[in-house]
């Protein structure tokens, strides 16, 4: 009889620990011997009960019942019908089975085409856009140089000013500009219908010839 009481007590402790609807247990599985109470076919756990802490009526009830739940000893003892425990166990098993099936179905639906067609297209578009951006950032550095010559003639200073603008594109969306200015003396005489400009302050053959002719004319008029 004593052995049966201990077996039922261990079963009842498991019931109150798992479901917790009827009572609170003050003993943990570690205090009762690890996880040995998880299986009813294990050897019974020996629970020592201090007879001085329990009244005589409760001891008599312990000796005559198979359905017992030990709560916070030595305050009170609560009894439960074994059929009620079986119903609670069955209800718990059904609930756990439903939860497992729901989680598995949800995972299967999300991993095997559970998304709508529009959602899948949006995901594909976002992925392609991100891949394109990464391709731009990871491309080789290239340079594009454009030169523009701006020629300004200043009559006051007789200067030919030439500015070269270099536009360098280092990578997408980043462009640097640099300017190099140069100046050369410039004469006010240029040859029309020709492919060149007079860009020096020295006399040309035409100027020398005109000077010689003017000198001869002045000499003739003087004499």
Curated annotation (Swiss-Prot):
Entry comment on modification after translation: The GPI-anchor is attached to the protein in the endoplasmic reticulum and serves to target the protein to the cell surface. There, the glucosamine-inositol phospholipid moiety is cleaved off and the GPI-modified mannoprotein is covalently attached via its lipidless GPI glycan remnant to the 1,6-beta-glucan of the outer cell wall layer.
Keywords assigned: Cell wall, Glycoprotein, GPI-anchor, Lipoprotein, Meiosis, Membrane, Secreted, Signal, Sporulation
Subcellular location: Secreted, Cell wall; Membrane
Record membrane topology: Lipid-anchor; GPI-anchor
Highest taxon of source: Eukaryota
An annotated GO BP: meiotic cell cycle
Signal peptide: 1-20
Residues bearing a lipid moiety (GPI-anchor amidated asparagine): 198
CC terms in the record's Gene Ontology section: extracellular region; fungal-type cell wall; prospore membrane; side of membrane
Keyword DNA-binding: no
Major location category of this protein: secreted
Propeptide residues, chain positions: 199-223
Function: Involved in sporulation. Essential for completion of the nuclear division.
Protein's UniProt name: Sporulation-specific protein 19
Organism for this UniProt entry: Saccharomyces cerevisiae (strain ATCC 204508 / S288c) (Baker's yeast)
Lineage: Eukaryota, Fungi, Dikarya, Ascomycota, Saccharomycotina
